[in-house]
Amino acid sequence: MHTTRSPSASIQAGAAGDALDLSLNGSQLTMGRRPSSASPGKHFSRSISVSVAYDGRGKRNTLTDAGLGSSRAIKNLRRSNSTTQVNQQANTSLSSEGHTEDFLALFNSSSDGRRKLASLSKMSKDRTTWNILDDQPRVFPVPSSSHSTCSMDSPTGLKKREAGVSLAANFTANNRSNKAAVGNAVTAILHNNHSEKPLTPKSSNQKPSFNNLIKATVNDDVTLDVSGSLTKSQKNFSSASSSSNNNAPRSPRSPGQPRRREVTEEEAERYIQQVNHAAIIIQRWYRRHVNSKRANENIIKQLLASKKKEREQRAEEAKTTESLKKKEDDRKRIREEKARLARLTAIQELQQKRAQRAAEVQQIAEQETEALRHPGKVGRKKLTKSSPTSPTDIKAKNTDSNVNVVSDLDDVTNLRAASPAGSACRVSQCSQEILQRSVSMEDQRQGASSSRAQSKTTLNDLLDTLKLLEEEPERLSEPKSYRKDKYSWIDEDGDSNSLTTDNVERHRQLSQTPALPDGGALLSEAKLQSIMSFLDEMEKSEQERPRSVTSGSHREVVLSEEDLAVVEQASATAAEVTGSMMRLRLELDEKKRTVNMLQTALAQQRELTIRHVKETEKELNHTFQLQKEQYEATIQRHLTFIDQLIDDKKALSERCEEVVGELKQVDQKYTKKIAQMQEQHELVWQILGPMCEEIKKLKELMSATEKVRREKWINEKTKKIKEITVKGLEPEIQKLISKHKQELKKLRVLHEAELLQADERAAQRYVRQSEELRQQLEKEKDEQCQRERELAKQRFEKQLQEEENVLQQQRRRLYKEVSEEKERLTQLAARQHAELEDLRKQLEDNSSLAGRALREELEKSRDEQERRHQVEIKALKERLEIEKQTWEENYMKKEEAWLLSRERELKEEVRRGRDKEIELAIQRLEVETREAREECERAADNRMKRVREKYEAELRDLERSERTSLQKQQEMREKHSEMEAELLRLQSLLRQREQEISDLTQVTARDKLSEERRSLSEVIRQEFAERLIELEEENRRMKMEVSEAKARLRLEVERVTREKEEELAEVHQRVKSAILKKEETVNNLRKQHEAAVKRADHLESLLEQQRKQLLGK
């Protein structure tokens, strides 16, 4: 802004200058009593009102009425003060009716000045202003600095410069109003971009009247004042006019009295120019601030929309992951249920086989017992011919006992066959009940036939004992009944002194308990005790036999001495035979116990190997399942990551399209505004062109008239002041004048400093606010990015922890199942002795079949994986080609540099995150493969089926994705063709505009406008050419980036293919090593089995030899 100085700076020193300052500055002076007058002092208040106008191009109307008529001058002055505030002072209420005389009345005795002051003081007392064309008042608030006046610069061309003068009534009000109106109209046209309608001339004549221009300008100024503009205090400068002047005495006006001087036109124009310049600066700054605010709001809205989309995408991804987890859980449950049903069916089949085997073994044992029993019957018949008892009774008794025992054994076998999976306790209870029932039946029979049993001979008892020793004892299922019921028949049959067939059968049944490792010595000791007790009983019976024969059997024939000697010799030989038989029996028991121990060890070894094989198979299945799930999870994660990248690309392309559309809209808008401004500029030039000369003429005329009037007025006033001034008032007046000068200077300096400080503060505040908003936006953006990274990291760690927890839970559950299975197998181990041969044969057959099947499946899996690898490579190539095309089409649309930099940053971040994830996944896969190298041997069958199904599904998905990508490619090509058509249309439109501009340049007659238009067209052409060059550079850069990305992707594909080939080779090698290990274990088992069979055959041959030797003796 221009520098300001006080209008009183050029006042000459002296009393005249002081008097002029007193009459022009509008200061309130409260005068006391005159020294030589009896009238009281009057209060006096004057106001200076400056109208707001713009002097960009000096404007005024023709001087129509410059006469001296007071009514017309007052009316013009009222019109000129249409936008001026008339402020009433706060101390007017203190003025009384006695102080109503104007202070100028001391110097001017005519009624002219009083009449003019009265006409000015008749204005509204409620601080109102009037419009130009109507008399409706408008209320304005009173500013705090109502007494302050704005200083104005004086032109440098003027030699003589007077003090500041008040606005007189004869100042050409129309000229000032017209200039202000035209200046404001030009300002509104040139600098107000909010108005869209250009000014159009009237239909009567091509130039609008000044009154209409003044009215429009005043309305605009009023709206600016109501909206709180900063120029309000600069446009309205007024002092309060006391209402006490209405009661001042009036004297008749002398026609020859001179009028007061006016404010010069140059000062008013400079002041108007300063005010309008300040208003233009403030409006421009406000528009820039509003535009930046709107741009920031749009950026924030876009960021919020993108964040909302990202949240929705995350929610959808979470839903998809949950559905996939549910599906995987359902599949796991179905697989577990199938495995459980398969195990149950296998157990049932095994139990049925064992029951059949036990029945067959039982039948074979019965047949052997029957076969051994018949020779005993024949020998007994031959040897008991000399006994007095009848053989029919003995035969009947033996048959009865045999029938009972056989029936009991049949019951036991039936129970075993019916419930093979029952508990050992239930079997032991059934066997105990059968034994107790058989014992009770034997007791009844023994009570009935005790007399017949006592008459048996020693030879018959010896033969029964030999037959019992020759028979192989059968084992019971429970050893608990051993201590309770095994030797109960000895205690219960205290009356019988010899072994009967019933006792022998009962002893055979009770001695069928299995030989325990810790109870073998007890079993042999019990048998030895039973044999020794039997021999003692035989000796007692031999000693008691002669007495019983001689006394009790009167029907027998008395033996001779020779027969007695023979009998004694036979008894001695029998004692020797029994001793040797006891020794042999003990040795046989020891051998049998060793054979049983070896058989149990062999069975346990076989069961252990079978169990190990099953456990390894389960573990391999489990590890294969885990590997499959992990691979599927990683593949799914990579697919989701790729989908996310595609979605990000789509979002970025949409944003680019939106930005392009906005740029087009802004371009169209500004082209319209440029056209409107050109039309307005033409209209202004049409309006103001012929007025410039008139304004210059009016300026010259005004300056001449003003000089003459000012000189006359100064001379008259100096004369009046010299004549009327009282010497006693001069010192007081001088003091007041100096005091008011100082106050005015201070107020002006303070006001200027406050205005400058306010402008600086406002500018600094808004700059600071914009910087703070920009910094806050950057900070929020960085915080949001960091927060998103932290959330992604936490989500990844949480997912990893969940997967590890699930893996640990599955591992614990499987360990628990394995332990339960081991316990169950240990419980069922006692029932699996009869299945060793079948299991061996089945194991050999299954191992051979499994080896062949594994070889075939390995060949198939290798072929299938090679085929799948080729298909995947082909699909990846097609997908990469499609993505390359879509990427090129998307990146051709990007025109702004900040979008490109942002996209590169996002690409780098995403690439780093993807590389980190890929590295982590590769490391995790390597660790998992290293851990699972020794556990993937028997997983080929189910694996190939599932892999085949999975890859068929993947092929379907790939075909579907290929179709969708082809559709997207077609759509993008259509969009590209549309954009090319749009570009052609815009080029044609540009050519049309250039043609129109050239036509307009030919039509227009003014060289200045034609040059401006040509320069504008050249600027537009240059801008368009620069934009085309930028687009070409952008396209080249995009092509380079696409080629680099293609090369990187090709390298990555090659690396992935190499890794897959290495993994396949490693899997193939591991499978081969697993098969070789399996074959080695099978060969070792086969050799061990053959050695065990040979040992068993050898032991059986030894037992057979010993049995033959015993029978031969």
From Swiss-Prot:
Residues 79-97 have a biased composition (Polar residues). Residues 276-296 form the IQ domain. GO terms for cellular component: acrosomal vesicle; centriolar satellite; chromosome, centromeric region; cilium; extracellular region. Residues 374-384 have a biased composition (Basic residues). The keyword Coiled coil applies. InterPro entries: CEP131. Disruption phenotype: Morpholino knockdown of the protein leads to truncated cilia formation and impaired intraflagellar transport processes. It is found in: Chromosome, Centromere; Cytoplasm, Cytoskeleton, Microtubule organizing center, Centrosome, Centriolar satellite; Cytoplasm, Cytoskeleton, Cilium basal body; Cytoplasmic vesicle, Secretory vesicle, Acrosome. Residues 78-97, 232-267, 306-331, 368-401, 438-458 are annotated as: Disordered. GO terms for biological process: cell differentiation; cilium assembly; epithelial cilium movement involved in determination of left/right asymmetry; intraciliary retrograde transport; intraciliary transport involved in cilium assembly; Kupffer's vesicle development; melanosome transport; negative regulation of intracellular protein transport. Residues 307-331 have a biased composition (Basic and acidic residues). Keywords: Cell projection, Centromere, Chromosome, Cilium biogenesis/degradation, Coiled coil, Cytoplasm, Cytoplasmic vesicle, Cytoskeleton, Differentiation, Transport. It comes from the Eukaryota. The keyword Membrane does not apply. Cilium-specific protein required for the regulation of cilium/flagellum formation. Involved in centriole duplication. May play a role in melanosome trafficking. Belongs to the CEP131 family. This is Centrosomal protein of 131 kDa.
